[in-house]
UniProtKB/Swiss-Prot annotation:
Catalyzes both the synthesis of cyclic ADP-beta-D-ribose (cADPR) from NAD(+), and its hydrolysis to ADP-D-ribose (ADPR). Cyclic ADPR is known to serve as an endogenous second messenger that elicits calcium release from intracellular stores, and thus regulates the mobilization of intracellular calcium. May be involved in pre-B-cell growth. It comes from Rattus norvegicus. NAD(+) binds at residues 110, 173, 211. Disulfide bonds join 52-68, 84-164, 145-158, 239-260, 272-281. This is ADP-ribosyl cyclase/cyclic ADP-ribose hydrolase 2. Keywords: Cell membrane, Disulfide bond, Glycoprotein, GPI-anchor, Hydrolase, Lipoprotein, Membrane, NAD, Signal, Transferase. It comes from the Eukaryota. Its main location: membrane. One of its GO terms (molecular function) is phosphorus-oxygen lyase activity. It is an enzyme of class 3 (hydrolase). One of its GO terms (biological process) is regulation of inflammatory response.
Amino acid sequence: MAVQACALSLRLGLWMSLLLPVLPGAGARAAGARWSGEGTTPHLQSIFLGRCAEYTTLLSLEPGNKNCTAIWEAFKVVLDKDPCSVLPSDYDLFINLSRHAIPRDKSLFWENNHLLVMSYAENTRRLMPLCDVLYGKVGDFLSWCRQENASGLDYQSCPTAEDCENNAVDAYWKSASMQYSRDSSGVINVMLNGSEPKGAYPTKGFFADFEIPYLQKDKITRIEIWVMHEVGGPHVESCGEGSVKILEDRLEALGFQHSCINDYPPVKFLMCVDHSTHPDCAMNSASASMWRESPALHAIGDISLIISLLVALASSSQA
């Protein structure tokens, strides 16, 4: 996955606007800011605890087994550390307290398509990407760090990988990514962006460096790669090309059974809901061929999605 992240829709934009009030100077790098990243998210503790409470009450697979206050206390230890001296291991207790089982066949890894992943996963109803497990949910889209030479939080800016390797947010996602990989099992889904100019599979990215190495081969049936191309966007890479071929070769060398499909239809249909008249969204023989070649497409959950999306597309075209 990329650093922060699980590009939802209008609902996400509304949710974020309600959840992340903008303070003067927040959201853009202020003049004279020490670091290149956004500063600590206003009301960090309240947002963290609110997300935790919502998850454990409404979504958790293990209701009643998580203490959100204890999880916050374990997390906030890093807020007392130098902003460039935070290690993944500093989140160990936080991960241990917030960790829970990931349903078999429900893991979804990704690069460069955070919001599409969130939209398709549908709040754990369809799949469960890292940003939909508890230890990923509480920090998603947030930023945090201590001031460089003081004890308070830095609301002006926080370091990113451009500033220093051991920054608080990257360390968090490294730790979460490693645990997510260890806990994933069955069929592993990977969504890549085939329209990304730098390539669909970053060979130096979170998926490459902190997720693939921690997959437990004895727990995994196969890995399915979905290379999605943006509606109206370029086809920079597809299955068997460029960095995708590098990924396929790596999985082969590691002994994983794997397959790759371009523009996995259920996800493509979702992308086309807002672009129903675009040529990229026309149902054609190529789409039908991809459908026939992928047995997984006949799962009940995907069929229900496709039916609902086809209805939406038909309604849009008649409007």
